């Protein structure tokens, strides 16, 4: 079974949304995969996803059950087969922390899609449309990633 970790900064908007979407898409496509999410900072550790992210995702039928924010741990670089970053800043942070022998596991989530976007924009300080855009980008990338 492949293990996938999705990472953003605080693990309350983008990466938990990606976790929820990947779980649902994997179940639909009958792909046996373990999915988790984390943040590069631990400020929101133990908190549920941002209410706006959760509301947008639930409107599309995704479950955020059991998802709580956590900071990435050193053992994650060993445990997971794929570590997908939401943006270049978080990818750089991951590359700085990741042992050389596991660097091949790191990539931008959107590098696995046909999107014109390279990064998933952080919707935290924006309006509702930002959360919808995150879902649009993540849905496309999740399906393409799982079908590879």
Protein language model annotation of sequence segments:
Residues 6, 84-85:
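Hydrophobic beta-strand core positions in alpha/beta domains
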Residues 82, 88-148:
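Phosphate-binding/catalytic loops
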Residues 1-79, 147:
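Conserved active-site segments centered on acidic
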């Amino acid at each position: 079974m492949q293990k996938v970790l999705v990472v953003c900064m605080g693990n309350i908007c983008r990466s938990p949304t990606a976790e929820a979407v990947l779980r649902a898409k994997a179940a639909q496509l009958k792909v046996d995969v373990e999915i988790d999410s984390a943040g590069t900072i631990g400020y929101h550790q133990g908190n549920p996803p941002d209410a706006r992210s959760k509301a947008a995702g639930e409107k599309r039928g995704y479950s955020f059950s059991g998802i709580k924010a956590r900071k990435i741990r050193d053992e994650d670089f060993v445990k997971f087969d794929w570590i997908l970053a939401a943006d270049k800043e978080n990818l750089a942070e991951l590359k700085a922390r990741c042992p050389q022998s596991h660097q091949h596991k790191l990539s931008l989530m959107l590098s696995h899609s046909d999107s014109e976007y390279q990064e998933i924009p952080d919707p935290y300080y924006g309006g509702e449309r930002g959360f919808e855009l995150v879902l649009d980008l993540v849905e496309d990338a999740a399906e393409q990633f799982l079908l590879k």
